[in-house]
Amino acid sequence: TLLEGLVWSDGAPVTSEDAKFTWEWVSDPAAGTTSGPAFANVADVEIVDERTFKVHLTDTDPAWYNIFGRGTSNGAPILPKHLMQDYMGEKAQSAPYNLNPVGTGPYKVAEFVPGDVVNFEINENYRFADKPFFKKVEYKGGGDAPAAARAVLQSGEVDYAINLQVEKAVLDSLLQSGSGELIVLPDGSVEHVIYNFADPNTEVDGAVSEPSTQHPYLSDKAVRQALALGLDRDTIVEQLYGQTADPTTNVIPVPDMFVSPNTSYSFDPNEAAGLLDEAGWTGSPRSKEGVEAKMLFQTTISPLRLKAQEIIKQTWDELGFDVELKSIDSSVFFSADAGNPDTWKRFSADVEMFAFNGRPFPIDLMSYWKSTPGGRYRSEVQRLVGPQPLPLAER
C-alpha cells in the first residue's frame, strides 16, 4: 500500500497504476532495461485501489520486496506512468525522463549535464516537511577516482565522495593531509573473475558465447581450479586496496548468515601447475588435443582493475596460459544496449572481471547461479532456487 498523499516531485499523485505500469515497462524486452530479470518471477500486478496493489508471483520468493527496489537489488523503483507511457519498448531509450527524472525523494533534479554534473534542489512536495537539511546538492561526475579522493582529502573542495577505487599508495598519501576522513563499511560488493563456459569465438545465429556452445578449455574443471589457485588475492588487496577491502573466496561475504564456510582457495601456483599437468594440459602456451589455452581477459578502464589484471596475468602466464588483456570504458561495459558486443552480459571474451553490488538480503544475486537451458550448474542449486515446490524451511 502506498503512503496516503504521496506525490511525484512534479506534483502528480503516485498511484497503483504507476506500479503496474513499471512492471509492464521494465519487463518489455524491447526496452533493453537492466532490471528486466528482476521481474521474471512476476505473473501480474493487480490494482486493488488507487493506493493498493498486489504482486502475483509465479513461484515463492523470499526476496519479493526487492522487485520494486533499487540500490540494494536488481529491481526497479516505481516509475511515473504519466511521463513514461508514451515511451514503451524501443522508444524507452529516447524518453525525456532518462535525462530529467522525477521521484518522491527529498530532492529533485534542477540541472543535468551528462558526464559532468547533476544539480539537485529541494523537492517542495517531499512527504516530510522538516527535511531535507541542505538547500541544494551538487553531484559531480567525470574525472577519475584519484581526482575525487584529492577533492575530498586534499583540497577540501568536495564534501563527500563514495566508492573510491583508489590505489592504496595514493590513498595513504592523501590521508596524511588530515583534511578528510576515510570511512569503510562492509557493503558486500565483491570484485570477482568470471569464466566463460561458452565459446566466445563461435557464432550461433550471429551471436557469440551462446549457452549451446562449450568453451574449448574453461569447460575443463581442472583448468578452472588451476586459474583459481593462481589468483593472488592477498597481494592484490595488500598492494592495491589496503584497508578498503578484504580478500575473500565467497561471492557473498556478508551478512554472516549467507557466508559459506566451505569455499576456500589458497594461492598455490605449484598445485595449479600439477592440476594442469595431470589433466593433460602441457607446453607453453599449454595445449591439449590441439586446443591452446589462449585467453582474452576483459575488465573496465579503472586504475585498480588494470593493475589487478596485471598481477593476475603474471601468474597465469607463468602457469602457461597466453593471456591478452582488454579494457573497456565502464559506460560501454555496463551498458544495457543489447547490440553492444563489449558489455559484460554479452561476454565476448574468455574471462572478465568486475564487481557485484552488495545486497542486505542477497537472494536475488544468487539467481545468477540458477540454471537456464544449456547452462552448467549444480543440480542442488537449481533444486533450491528453481520453481519446484520446497518447504519454506528447506529453502
Residues of each region from the PLM?
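Primarily extracytoplasmic ectodomains and periplasmic/lumenal surface modules that are beta-strand-rich
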Residues: 7-8, 61-64, 247
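Mature extracytoplasmic/periplasmic domains
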Residues: 80-83, 243-263
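Extracytoplasmic/periplasmic ligand-capture domains
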Residues: 1-34, 44-46, 106-240, 256-395
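Short, P/G- and charge-enriched loop/turn segments at secondary-structure junctions
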Residues: 41-42, 91-98, 104-109
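Contiguous mixed-secondary-structure segments that line small-molecule binding/active-site clefts
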Residues: 90-98, 253-254, 271-272
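Surface-exposed binding/hinge segments that line
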Residues: 37-87, 111
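A structural "hinge/loop" feature
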Residues: 12, 34, 64-76, 104, ...
